[in-house]
């Protein structure tokens, strides 16, 4: 960056912590609401350049009024800045009770009523009208420093507050500094406050005062001289040091800077080539880069990464060339950057290196790098220096405050040196707060410690909590929320446990030899796989978009609604009562294996320990990598073919099933039936509904009852949510099979198994031989 001319040393106002005695970056600033006094100050006009001759104004009574919240900066005032296109006017004070009675006060026309209310002047009139540009170079006297403060113009002036006449102290403000520099040779920048926050001799009578103490003393001086128009106590956000939390100041000092303007356009282009998650992050960092000034990269601290710059002992010229860069880099590589502090330049700089003046003796720069410059170089120090790693990084992940911190410093150093961003994607997160949305503090007793959560619920519940929330915003955590998440976790785990149990019983299920082709699966099985395909698609898309909470909700809903509440419930009869190696049972096992194999892969990024446990116990294909889930690919969709007619059929079955379950519950409450298999159900429907439902032989299994009859009509006892369909529930006819618990006319038809239905008797004979 130095070789490209991006780095320079210069005098410029920077954030300065007088307590830490160092410059600060914007990312090292935190704002707190502070009480302070704002003051309105009168600067007497001494040379109007003839602009006011036609107004009949007594110049000895004419003043420009400024407003400031930092009284201590007034000794550094060199000018008053006006907006070139704003209208200004004189306010003649006609309030006899005012100390300013009979005076003419210049301010922005738009702010007259606001200012007069603030200073308590009730009677006044206005005289004259001027654009700010017409008043340029009119002279005023500084109220107490014995020098001129001319009127200048600048586009940074606003009418949001104050008087429209801006107190300009270039040693204490960047905009002040820049606008004064436009007036070439007119101003000599002064900084009448030292590194400890104490006013210097350049502050005149106020030398030796700390800035906080100077506020009161200067205000008293202004009041005694009748140049203090008004003083008000206000509370406003004020910058504080992030380390010591003390108020900071803006102070012009000699620092090392990076000229961001030289590669700003290139940086904005690089931003557009990055995936920002969430998307608004792109606009946010673009605005920050476009609006930022040069980057102050030096700090005045006793430890840190040194700025490897040398100065000529004789003429003070900065010495940086290929030889010094190589010599210092080699030393740092061998002995670390700490060697900078222990060695004399003569020990590591080649004797051939000389200043243009001929001197070969040098002194070291003792400032250190801004920590953000330091951390912003990690992409080069870590990724580019290690062949086993790739550059740029796939992802930078941090809190949303890092748009002005690590994300931006990394971006600037990378674009400056390589022309592109150091990352392919950037993802930001919010902060963790308690269940009420309040910041956690030990004193409040609302801190939730991760180790306590892990001890009580396990690490996967903590991971599930993280995944269950939209982390782009602040996320809440409380014992109640974690308890709810533990229940959700148990639902997912129990789904896997049920499937594992039914794949492992008997001789077990071997996916290499026992799988049933998709086209031979029942409609129940095909429906389950169609739901799985939908989940696979949604979860993978959610992971790609870093929307982990959408992935979690899709998985949880699938396990609870589609599996536990429906599919796994209705296939129990097949699993428990069909012959162990029958095609219908193998079909259900095939479906469950596909579901479990997909589910364990889908949950692995969130429930890492649980997925690993499932992987160890589940059956595997010979092509699986048995080392663990992460060594295998995410699942692909099963490819089961589902028509629109099929989907409509199952939507109807689900809707009618909900009504049937409610009707069963009514009869159970009335004591007519016990379990659902004690019931027989008659569905009444008309027209297309009758034709559709009467063609479903699977209804008894879908409703978990002994039998279902479908009749044309509307005579059902229970009318539910499905329009045109009603339900009647009766105690099932026939004896109960002691094996499958269904009531069937065939119970007792087999002499060998008189207490079983015909199906169960046949299975017993097949399995027992």
What are the language-model segments listed below?
Residues 1-75, 94-96, 137-139, 147-152, ...:
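Residue patterns forming the tRNA-binding/recognition surfaces of aminoacyl-tRNA synthetases
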Residues 13, 237, 308, 348-353, ...:
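Short metal-coordination and nucleic-acid-contact micro-motifs, chiefly zinc-binding Cys/His arrays
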Residues 150-152, 720-756:
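C-terminal accessory/binding modules appended to enzymatic or scaffolding proteins
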Residues 79, 86-165, 174-178:
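Protease-associated
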Residues 320, 361-372, 388-405, 442-445, ...:
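Secondary-structure capping and boundary motifs in well-ordered enzyme cores
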Residues 14, 18, 25-32, 362, ...:
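Acidic, turn-prone loop/beta-hairpin segments
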Residues 21, 300, 316, 358-359, ...:
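Cys/His-coordinated zinc-binding microdomains
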Residues 17, 241, 312, 352-356, ...:
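Short cysteine-rich clusters marking metal-coordination/redox-active sites
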